Regions:
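Short C-terminal domain-edge/linker segments immediately following a structured domain
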Residues: 153-156, 167-172, 201-204, 254, ...
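A general structural signal for short secondary-structure junctions and capping/turn motifs
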Residues: 7-16, 23, 113, 128-129, ...
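Regulatory N- and C-terminal appendages and interdomain linkers associated
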Residues: 1-96, 314-365
């Protein structure tokens, strides 16, 4: 179990990921996996086509403050080509490519983010009849991010729609209140159920560690507030999967150790006792185990592909291997020589207790 009461970073280092993670190419067997599960499609354009903008305008938030986004503009010929293609992509995301609704859809805006490894474009699609809009993202395809998206889709309570086309990645927009804004504007509100929020942060912390999903600083997750009988429930969702099984420091896979999340950690320590924290950790691992068993063949296929994929450096693999060995006191970690092997061992060690309790027959078989 992860100890929330030991929330000070024992490694003596600032809990900050590497400033620049390299982009790892999608190897052929991962590409075949994506095709088998309907994740690879043929697009009429690529990420590189979107880079041919002519100028940008900085975007500000509703309070007039600068954001990391810029609105981009294209020459007329380029814009006409992109508009049709981007509406088609939206149809693929939402209606399996049914273009019968495309006539009342249009591209309202394209934004570019210069911050982050994937340098995403955010596409705003608008319904011309009622002005309702939606977003999706176009990024550089990266093997780390693909593994993170797949693991989140399979092991977490959240389904994710995305697809690839060669070196281009299309991701749906994950709605919610950005974590940093939630901490700033909502966490102290009188109607915030702090016990339920603390419970969800414990579960989110556990999911990230079991999946080895790193860098969950507050701007890399969103919070959903769900009305429930007489109160609210909360769901914290990761929105950035760039740091899947890349970093060497164990605490980078634990949201509780990021300074940005200190207010959530304090809430856990104030409202939950040790037994309650352990209960919620066990609940989350049990549900992850159900999902793992239900999708065991797909998970095995993915982990076998990840097994020999080079998605980190030898130094980081060695550092994480040693840290997990010390944490679990399990020599099985010392046999791993890739991040994929480490993750496979980590899933077994984290969920073995719960796997033993799974029924051998029935709906989970």
């Amino acid at each position: 179990m992860i100890n929330f009461f030991d929330h000070i970073n024992p490694e003596g280092k600032a809990n900050i990921p590497s400033k620049k993670k390299p982009m790892f190419p999608i190897k052929e067997d991962l590409r075949q996996y994506l095709k088998r599960y309907g994740r690879e499609v043929l697009l009429p354009f690529s990420y590189q086509d979107l880079q041919r903008f002519t100028y940008t305008i900085p975007l500000k938030d509703k309070n007039g403050k600068d954001t990391a986004w810029e609105q981009v503009s294209y020459d007329m010929r380029e814009w006409d080509f992109l508009r049709k293609s981007l509406v088609k992509v939206y149809a693929i995301l939402k209606t399996e490519g049914d273009l019968s609704f495309a006539n009342h859809l249009d591209v309202a805006r394209i934004d570019y983010c210069y911050f982050g490894n994937s340098q995403p474009f955010r596409i705003r699609i608008v319904n011309k009849f009622n002005d309702n809009y939606d977003h999706y993202y176009i990024k550089k395809a990266d093997a780390s991010r693909i593994y993170g998206l797949e693991l989140e889709h399979i092991l977490s309570p959240n389904r994710i729609t995305y697809f690839t086309s060669k070196d281009t990645l299309i991701e749906e927009h994950i709605p919610g209140i950005p974590g940093d804004l939630f901490i700033r504007d909502y966490i102290s509100a009188a109607n915030t159920n702090k016990i339920r929020l603390a419970k969800e942060f414990v579960k989110f912390n556990e999911r990230c560690f079991v999946q080895l999903l790193g860098d969950m600083r507050s701007y890399n997750f969103v919070v959903n507030i769900i009305p429930d009988i007489e109160d609210f429930q909360y769901r914290i969702r990761a929105i950035d999967f760039d740091q899947q099984s890349y970093e060497g420091r164990k605490n980078l896979y634990l949201p509780q150790f990021f300074k940005d999340n200190q207010a959530l950690v304090n809430m856990v320590l104030k409202h939950l006792d040790k037994q309650s924290i352990e209960q919620y950790q066990a609940e989350e691992k049990t549900m992850m185990t159900f999902r793992l068993v239900s999708s065991r063949y797909r998970v095995k296929e993915l982990l076998d592909i990840m097994d020999d994929d080079q998605i980190s450096t030898d130094e980081k693999i060695t550092e994480l291997r040693e840290a997990l060995f010390v944490h679990f006191n399990n020599p099985q970690y010392l046999k791993a020589i890739t991040m994929g092997q480490l993750l496979k061992t980590h899933l077994k060690c984290s969920l073995r207790k719960y796997l033993k309790k799974m029924p051998k027959t029935g709906k989970h078989e």
